[in-house]
């Protein structure tokens, strides 16, 4: 970066000047300035801030203000090139070292670091295992260490990386170099674990609000998941970029093919694809408009695509942390976005079964995480309030999630629950048998299936006693009893057994109220966040909307020519402001949020030309 002349009496450039000149913003978000000034002064920090909340500036600005190079530890090898490209577009001297580089490129980056010609250097955590790397870093001047995605140090987290456990040693080797650890996802317990494992107990801590008000949360019963997803995309997100998460590789391939066959541009992404294919699909998703990525959780961490309009889950995430982080990839630009999930009985059975693996401590942790996820799915209260409470924060009903917009009915399910639990009990006591949910429902409905006849279950006194409910309603009952811990899943085949908590219900000592699943319907287009469309130009005046489209077309051509994602040139939010205010001079353009000095020099005249050519 070109030197910044300080406006103060000190020789150190001021953070606010860097914010305006380099990044093009006039003011900091809540908490940013305090943390930045603390790190600039040489202090350690631990930052918990939601995706899209401005975490990166908390280390990027101190790295530009302090003498030396900011060393950023990041697990996101596949994204380092894009991160560096985005910084270079701002005039920041950035580089990376990882296993994907050619030898010559690595030599150039190393020489730049040793010559003091880098503001930021990105490294994967595994490189710091090497004494050779540590000695190399010692030969240059380090401004700070930034530990990105710091939740990876948590052994109980959903993204645990063993190499992160070694990062506490950085302070031992460089005791005078400040450290800043950052994550978008951490409960109070995980927060404490990060601080303890990285030796940051005495650091300055910033816990920003976890609420993402532009995201609308919607969870519906899983019935025909492919069709439900297709309805969502066609009625609410036609032509939008989005991510669809599935639990297995085979599901990813099937859903991607299904969407393609229905005219929706979709790409698969999972660990079973070769590295070149994964890289190509990721690059297309970042650079092209309107693509849908169908993926396992192997995809998404660090994806800085601001205009992802929806994140859909076709399988239940294993934890609320995972769900929050995955849904947080939508709407990074602050515009309306949707977090949608189809959730059903088989999800609960499958994850309950997985939670029986491992040692006792691991099993207990997995069950606790799953219980919290199930509570979020089955709540009759505001989903946003429930989500924030999980992270130790208060909230009030948002009026914007599915449970606020259409409050679910509850019903007295005591008798049906007793019938189901009694069926499980009788099979176990009288026949020494255990079965899965489907067979139990067949017994209750009085279906003489081949399996029912084979085991003579038509002779049970409970055979046919549950005809007052449909099969779908019985599946909802089983799902909720599993979520409440009144039933448990056992063994390879997912058979159901009673728990100690089921006894009071069986004896009639505990009444049971369950959530009634809503009748499937088309999503309400008027119920988008803020009551407006998710389309970036939806609320612009006609002339501004036309200009916005022209600016996006110019941006797409420019990004293609430069070989970078479109958002590296400008975010939609910046183009919206340009279209709305219609600046006529470079001076006026420089006042737009997101137009820093380097981008003004690089793109200013071209933008003014687009504005002048507006018919």
Q: For each predicted feature, which ranges?
A:
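Helicase motor core with emphasis on the C-terminal RecA-like subdomain
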Residues: 2-22, 26-30, 34-46, 50-56, ...
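Helix-turn-helix/winged-helix DNA-binding modules
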Residues: 27, 303, 379, 431-432, ...
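Eukaryotic partner-binding/assembly regions in large regulatory complexes
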Residues: 310-315, 377, 416, 476-477
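Short, charged low-complexity linear segments at domain edges
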Residues: 362-391
């Amino acid at each position: 970066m070109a030197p910044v002349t300080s406006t103060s009496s000190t020789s150190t450039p001021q953070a606010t000047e860097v914010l305006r000149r380099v990044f093009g913003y006039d003011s900091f978000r809540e908490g940013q300035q305090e943390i930045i000034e603390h790190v600039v002064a040489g202090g350690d920090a631990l930052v918990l801030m939601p995706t899209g909340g401005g975490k990166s500036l908390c280390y990027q600005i101190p790295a530009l203000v302090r003498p030396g190079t900011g060393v950023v530890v990041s697990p996101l090898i596949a994204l380092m090139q894009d991160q560096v490209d985005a910084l270079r577009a701002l005039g920041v001297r950035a580089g990376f070292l990882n296993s994907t580089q050619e030898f010559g490129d690595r030599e150039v980056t190393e020489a730049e670091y040793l010559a003091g010609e880098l503001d930021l250097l990105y490294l994967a955590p595994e490189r710091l295992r090497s004494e050779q790397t540590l000695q190399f870093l010692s030969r240059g001047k380090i401004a700070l260490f930034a530990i990105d995605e710091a939740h990876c140090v948590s052994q109980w987290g959903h993204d645990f990386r063993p190499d992160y456990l070694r990062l506490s040693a950085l302070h031992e080797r460089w005791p005078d170099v400040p450290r800043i650890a950052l994550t978008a996802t951490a409960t109070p317990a995980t927060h404490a674990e990060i601080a303890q494992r990285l030796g940051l107990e005495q650091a300055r801590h910033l816990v920003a609000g976890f609420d993402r008000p532009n995201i609308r949360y919607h969870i519906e019963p899983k019935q025909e998941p492919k069709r439900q997803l297709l309805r969502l995309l066609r009625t609410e997100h036609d032509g939008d970029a989005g991510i669809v998460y599935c639990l297995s590789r085979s599901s990813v391939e099937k859903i991607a093919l299904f969407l393609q066959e229905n005219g929706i541009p979709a790409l698969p992404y999972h660990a079973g694809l070769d590295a070149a294919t994964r890289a190509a699909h990721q690059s297309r998703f970042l650079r092209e408009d309107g693509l849908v990525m169908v993926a396992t959780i192997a995809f998404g961490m660090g994806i800085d695509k601001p205009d992802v309009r929806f994140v859909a889950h076709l399988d239940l995430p294993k934890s609320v942390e995972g769900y929050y982080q995955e849904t947080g990839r939508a709407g990074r630009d602050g515009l309306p976005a949707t977090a949608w999930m189809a959730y059903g009985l088989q999800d609960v059975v499958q994850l309950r079964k997985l939670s029986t693996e491992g040692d006792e401590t691991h099993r207990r942790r997995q069950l606790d995480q799953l219980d919290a996820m199930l509570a979020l799915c089955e709540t009759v209260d505001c989903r946003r309030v429930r989500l924030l409470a999980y992270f130790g924060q208060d909230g009030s009903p948002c009026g914007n999630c599915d449970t606020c917009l259409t409050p679910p009915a509850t019903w007295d399910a005591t008798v049906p629950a007793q019938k189901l639990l009694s069926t499980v009990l009788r099979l176990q006591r009288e026949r020494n048998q255990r079965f899965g949910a489907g067979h139990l429902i067949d017994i209750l409905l009085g279906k003489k299936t081949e399996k029912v006849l084979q085991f003579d279950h038509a002779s049970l006194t409970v055979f046919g006693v549950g005809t007052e409910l449909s099969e779908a309603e019985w599946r909802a009952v089983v799902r909720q009893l599993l979520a409440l811990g009144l039933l448990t899943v056992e063994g390879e085949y997912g058979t159901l057994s009673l728990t100690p908590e089921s006894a009071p219900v069986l004896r009639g000592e505990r009444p049971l109220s369950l959530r009634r699943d809503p009748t499937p319907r088309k999503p309400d287009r008027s119920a988008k966040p803020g009551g407006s469309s998710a389309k970036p130009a939806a609320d612009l005046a006609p002339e501004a909307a036309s200009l916005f489209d022209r600016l996006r077309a110019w941006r797409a051509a420019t990004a293609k020519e430069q070989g970078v994602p479109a958002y590296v040139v400008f975010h939609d939010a910046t183009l919206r402001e340009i279209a709305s205010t219609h600046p006529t001079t470079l001076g006026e353009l420089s006042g737009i949020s997101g137009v820093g000095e380097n981008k003004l020099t690089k793109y200013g005249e071209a933008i003014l030309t687009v504005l002048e050519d507006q018919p």
